[in-house]
Every structure is written in structure tokens, then in C-alpha cells.
């Protein structure tokens, strides 16, 4: 009987070993076979091939700052939004935050949550919103026969003396997005320190997501911009115009949400993650993409002039003293206006200036690396104001032509919003070239 059990053990062990993925490797290291991968371009983005370029000014330094040096640098391939982020897309973020808060803090209705069972049930006890159900049954719309949510959601509207004409308007101060982010740079600074835990490098932040619509007034004193304050973010005529009035922290929060939004979709379809996280472009990525592969070009369209042969202005900016409209618009224009550059990117110069991921230092070019250069600093609320400066690129509808140059750089503080600053996202390409077969 003992021999029988021993024989069964050997047979079972043989079956176990025979089923191992390396059973046919004949003792050689053959690697772990993974699924075939074919890179796809994310929706609304274009592929920017990697390459080397001379970063910095190609024209005279009219500011006489004498701190802008040229530097030959190399950029890895990446994907970039072909346009500035529109009001419509940012509205999707705001609405997601609004609905999340309504469901989790005010309704507490089980039908808005998924109810997985068995192994699929979350082990941390957290509840997850069933967004497919929410899309068909919005908490703000009372369909025939549906439970009336008006009373439960009343606290999300302005109350008492804050109401105007007794209208139900969302109190936008409640719309805050809370997120966690692993800081790889912080972790790398403590390399080999065994006293640190992973949680020491996870940063937590809570950001108000609604744009500051009053920027149209406090950015331009003694100007009648009330119509832009009332309608720019809310009126459907502006849905395809670039979002403005967002701080750097709000733009960063959007990139985190966009990453999570895509990952949750993949998880809901039981698909593996196939994309790097979204982020703001570094200033080197922005300049490289703006040049469109052209060498020594002043502007994204390649030529040294801001007008074409017919005398038409090639971007939305301020062409003369007190003159904002000769380019075809008084304020901003739709995100697909004017011709794209050779990479297919719209408005890399003009329309709205854009936040980058890079912190600002006047002499950054003298100390950043020549491979994927950037200067990053995660400023805290307690840090001096000078540490909260972020690089702004591209020039805007209210700027003169010099700011439209590919190499022109300026800055704003990360917690300030402007009527002329927006943003677009990037995500890294994993591999050497999109044409490679994996």
C-alpha cells in the first residue's frame, strides 16, 4: 500500500512537471511567452516618432535674458493629443466627478453599484459604481416610474441666499477629485533605504475640478467680458473650443482620471492594460512635437513668417496693438482651426498657451539631461511661490507673435488659472517604433 501511494505521488508529480510552460524547453532558458501585441494610436492622438533635435532658440533673443541656451537632445516616441483639450472633453471629467459624488455621498442607492460575487468580489470591501447602469439611468434625470432623486440631491445645489432666480444650480465647490499617485522620482531618491515603505512614496491629492470661469474678468481689468464668463464653458457653441481657466493641478488631475478611466474600461472587459499612463508633455516633448520634424524652424508651420503668401495669418494671436481680430477671431477658436503641422498637431502655436509637466527654471537647459530632458519638482502648498512655477508653451490668442515661436517659454504658478492657458495630454509609446511587429 505504501508503494502504491509512492507511485501515485510520482505520477502526479510527472503530470505537474509536464504541464509546466517550460516543459518543452529541453532545459534551456526560452523566456516567458506573452500575448502578441500590436500598438494602436489612442483616440484623438497622433504618433510622434522619436528623434534628436536642437532644443532652444533659433532666432535672436529679443528679451536679452541671455539664459536660453541651445542643446542637442533626444526624445523617445510618444503619443500626443492632436488638439488642445476641448470644453466638451473636460466636461466629461466634471460630469464624472459630479455623478460620483451624487451616488456615493447623497443617493447611497445599491442599484448604482456593481455586485460581483465569489472570486470577483472586491477583497477590500469597497463598492464600485456601475457606470453602464448610470449611463442608462442618470441620477439627475427622473424617468417615468423611476425613483425621484430630487430631494436626495438637493444638498448639491446652492442653498438659501446663494440661489439666483431660485434656479437649481450645482454648487461647483463640491466637485472635487481625490486621487493617489505613485511617485517614482521620490522612490528613486531613497534607493536602498530599507526603512521606507511603498506607502511613503504614494502621494494623495484632492483637487477642485470645475474651471474658474471668472478668469475672463480678473485677467482683463476694465473689459466687458461677462458674456465669456457666462457662456464659454457651458454654452454648446463653445463645446469644441479649448478649455481654459484650469490650473496646472487641475490639468494634472485630469491626466490621472483619464488614465484610470481607460484602465477601468479594460478591467471591465477582462482585458490586460496595454497603455502607459497619460500625463502633461514635458517642455522638451512639446517643443519637439511643435517643430513637426523640421530643423531650425521658428514656427510649427515651418516658415520664418507668421503670414502665408496671400497675407493670411497662420495662427490665433494678437497681431498688432489693440488688434485681436485680424486672424479671424477675437478670443479663442475651435481646437481644429488653422492647418496642422507635419505631425498632424493643431494649434501648437497660438489659440491657447499650454501647461507642461516641467517645472520652470530660467537656466534649466544648462543642467537637464540630453536624453528625454525635463526638470520636475512636485511643489507642496507650503513651498515658496518660486517653487510652484510651471513651464507654459505655445503662446495664446492674447499674446504677440514672439510667444508663438517653437522655442519661446514662459511660466505660470501651478495653482493659478488663466483665460489663455489650456493643455493637452501625452502618453508614452512602448517600443522602438510603431511600425515594428511585436
PLM regions and their residue ranges:
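Functional-site microenvironments in short loops/helix caps that host divalent-cation chemistry
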Residues: 20-26, 47-48, 54, 59, ...
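Post-signal peptide N-terminal segment of mature Sec-exported envelope proteins
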Residues: 26-54
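Short capping motifs at secondary-structure boundaries
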Residues: 78, 85, 94-103, 255-268
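Short proline/glycine-enriched turn/loop segments at secondary-structure junctions
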Residues: 379-383, 410-417
